[in-house]
């Protein structure tokens, strides 16, 4: 049984690097998910992620060709299987199944946009890779890289259901999940184009807000740091043992500056929308 302990926020930087490399170097091959990768290499990739290997080193290993395309394809499956929650969160299963069945693209978009940003970021990249795989000219007659076969391969990787011993229920869940994944791949351009725009706008706004807040925090920190340095340089270098009078002077000066600064105009705190 797969150890489902990986957290997506920890995995994302590594998985995005793998998918990016995979998309650039491996999608012109037809045997990607039909041949098992080297288990030792797959385990090494998982171990490097768990041990928080620096992403630059991780990327360097990829670019050195340390892993084969089969190592990477099965690592993608293993990583997704090891997440503590699936990419397509369980509480949205019914929405995906019903909307895919009725081919309601707008509702599928809305459901996707309700996912956390970290989930949506990986989903966008993963299905972009699937779309490119299925649309390679040399793959169009190759059934193993059709939306239906990729849907079957990733059905229980991307979606999870309540455990059941009933074989009919298991089979039904597999059919539902396969249909959802293959539908998302087949209608990638219709579903994900506007979703990507909405997502990127949100991400851009979040990044801008984060930068504004960090700049504000840095100004506050620098101002306070300079204040304490000026007091330190004024008294500490000249006297190893501070007298009671020195201590009182420092306290007084600190308080005077503290309260005198209240009347100054300060930059507004960035508001997150």
From Swiss-Prot:
The keyword Iron-sulfur does not apply. SMART domains: RhoGAP. It is found in: Cytoplasm. GO terms for biological process: signal transduction. One of its GO terms (cellular component) is cytoplasm. Disulfide bonds: none annotated. Residues 1-192 form the Rho-GAP domain. Keywords: Cytoplasm, GTPase activation. The record marks 34 as: Arginine finger. GO terms for molecular function: GTPase activator activity. It comes from the Eukaryota. Rho GTPase-activating protein involved in the signal transduction pathway. This is Rho GTPase-activating protein gacB.
């Amino acid at each position: 049984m797969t150890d489902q302990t990986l957290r997506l926020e920890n995995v994302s930087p590594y998985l995005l690097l793998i998918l990016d490399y995979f998309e650039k170097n491996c999608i012109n091959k037809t045997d990607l998910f039909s041949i098992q990768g080297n288990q030792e290499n797959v385990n090494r990739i998982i171990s490097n992620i768990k041990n928080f290997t620096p992403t630059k080193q991780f990327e360097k290993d990829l670019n050195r060709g340390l892993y084969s395309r089969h190592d990477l394809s099965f690592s993608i499956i293993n990583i997704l299987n090891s997440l503590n929650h699936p990419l397509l969160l369980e509480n949205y299963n019914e929405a995906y199944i019903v909307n895919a069945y009725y081919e309601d693209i707008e509702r599928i978009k809305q459901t996707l946009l309700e996912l956390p940003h970290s989930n949506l970021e990986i989903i966008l990249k993963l299905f972009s890779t699937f779309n490119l795989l299925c649309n390679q000219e040399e793959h169009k007659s190759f059934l193993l890289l059709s939306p239906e076969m990729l849907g079957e391969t990733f059905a229980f990787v991307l979606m999870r259901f309540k455990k059941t011993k009933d074989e009919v229920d298991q089979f039904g869940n597999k059919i539902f999940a396969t249909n959802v994944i293959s539908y998302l791949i087949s209608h990638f351009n219709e579903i994900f184009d506007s979703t990507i725009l909405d997502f990127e706008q949100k991400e851009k706004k979040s990044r801008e807000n984060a930068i504004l807040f960090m700049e504000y925090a840095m100004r506050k920190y620098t101002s306070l740091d300079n204040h304490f340095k000026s007091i330190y340089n004024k008294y500490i270098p000249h006297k190893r043992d501070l007298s009671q009078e020195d201590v009182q002077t420092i306290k007084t000066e600190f308080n005077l500056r503290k309260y005198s600064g209240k009347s100054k105009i300060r930059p507004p705190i960035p508001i997150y929308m």
